[in-house]
């Protein structure tokens, strides 16, 4: 993704998000990194030419998918995925220095869900205030809008907050996967360890339509790694599927399976072929 020439990256901000931490794994010091308030704004920065790439979260090992990211890729103005990065996520409980009474705690809904046990044990009567990101909650805390926040230790450091307790998540080993999106056109060359993503639209009145899709992948021995249904937003009961498979669109099995799917599906939106991040 990054080259010797400086690239412009949009990401889910503000400063101190897990997305920013993930971005640091794939960028150079010379790259321009601009935070945006939400996933849509970050992706729109690429669509509008304000950025070359956008890094946004797509799924978490505990809470599952980030619906907004899936919907933007499937039914928003076209973008393709050129890479992915994963990041272990740990949460800290933070306050402004000297705080004693905690009644309002800010965080992202996914973070709240991953810290339910801690909140129930330590602050069962506190109001949980949702924010677009954990770092946005930390920023609000620094401005006096909250009594506490659940965010990353990096956010606490950036906003000069006191970490009351670290590593408060209910599940150790939680990981978030992020995707790097760009305008359609360029596709990374095959590496032998690739992932291909697509949005598949089917005729809901056709019995066995989803089974037919799965049979096509089985026919060409293509392994599915992810499948998620999402509403199309047109009518109640109308859904499309986001599908990830192992392999590159230039690999013969993937190429043939996608070509055959185009014959039996209402529509397919190619979302990219890109290197998988292989974790030890």
What annotation goes with each model-predicted range?
Residues 1-280:
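Domain-level signature for soluble enzymes in the chorismate/prephenate branch of the shikimate pathway
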């Amino acid at each position: 993704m990054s080259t010797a020439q400086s690239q412009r990256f949009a990401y889910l901000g503000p400063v101190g998000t897990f997305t920013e931490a993930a971005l640091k794994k794939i960028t150079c010091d010379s790259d321009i990194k601009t935070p945006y308030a939400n996933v849509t704004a970050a992706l729109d920065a690429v669509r509008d030419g304000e950025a070359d790439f956008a890094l946004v979260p797509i799924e978490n090992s505990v809470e599952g998918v980030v619906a907004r990211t899936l919907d933007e890729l499937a039914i928003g103005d076209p973008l393709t995925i050129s890479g992915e990065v994963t990041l272990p996520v740990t949460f800290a409980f933070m306050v402004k220095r000297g705080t004693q009474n905690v009644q309002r705690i800010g965080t992202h809904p996914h973070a709240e869900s991953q810290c339910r046990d801690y909140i129930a044990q330590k602050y069962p009567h506190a109001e949980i205030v949702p924010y677009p990101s954990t770092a946005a909650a930390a920023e609000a805390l620094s401005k006096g809008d909250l009594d506490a926040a659940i965010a990353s230790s990096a956010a606490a450091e950036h906003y000069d907050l006191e970490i009351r307790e670290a590593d408060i998540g209910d599940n150790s080993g939680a990981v978030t996967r992020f995707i790097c999106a760009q305008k359609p056109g360029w596709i990374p060359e095959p590496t032998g360890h690739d992932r291909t993503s697509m949005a598949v639209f089917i005729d809901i009145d056709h019995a066995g339509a989803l089974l037919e899709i799965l049979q096509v992948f089985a026919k060409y021995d293509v392994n599915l790694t992810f499948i998620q249904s999402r509403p199309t937003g047109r009518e109640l009961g109308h859904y499309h599927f986001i599908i990830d498979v192992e392999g590159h669109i230039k690999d013969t099995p993937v190429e043939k399976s996608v070509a055959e799917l185009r014959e039996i599906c209402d529509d397919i939106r190619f979302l990219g072929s890109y290197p998988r991040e292989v974790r030890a």
